[in-house]
Every structure is written in C-alpha cells, then in structure tokens.
Amino acid sequence: MVKQIEFKYAFQEALNSAGDK
C-alpha cells in the first residue's frame, strides 16, 4: 500500500514537472 502511494506521488510530481515545463 505504501509503495502504491509513493508511486502515485512520484507520478503526480512528474506530471507537475512536465506541466511546469
């Protein structure tokens, strides 16, 4: 469960980074 949350967080961060760029 924790791994899933971490993955979701990393995915959202990547999306945010891509949107920022």
Curated annotation (Swiss-Prot):
Function (record text): Participates in various redox reactions through the reversible oxidation of its active center dithiol to a disulfide and catalyzes dithiol-disulfide exchange reactions. Plays a role in the reversible S-nitrosylation of cysteine residues in target proteins, and thereby contributes to the response to intracellular nitric oxide. Nitrosylates the active site Cys of CASP3 in response to nitric oxide (NO), and thereby inhibits caspase-3 activity.
| Residues recorded as bearing N6-acetyllysine in the entry | 3
Positions bearing N6-succinyllysine: 8
Q: Which domain of life is it from?
A: Eukaryota
Q: Where in the cell is it found?
A: Nucleus; Cytoplasm; Secreted
Keywords recorded for this protein, A-Z: Acetylation, Activator, Cytoplasm, Electron transport, Nucleus, Redox-active center, Secreted, Transcription, Transcription regulation, Transport
Q: How does it assemble?
A: Homodimer; disulfide-linked. Interacts with TXNIP through the redox-active site. Interacts with MAP3K5 and CASP3. Interacts with APEX1; the interaction stimulates the FOS/JUN AP-1 DNA-binding activity in a redox-dependent manner.
Organism, by scientific name, is: Canis lupus familiaris
Give the protein's recorded name: Thioredoxin
Cite the source lineage. Eukaryota, Metazoa, Chordata, Craniata, Vertebrata
Major location category of this protein: nucleus
* Keyword Iron among record annotations: no
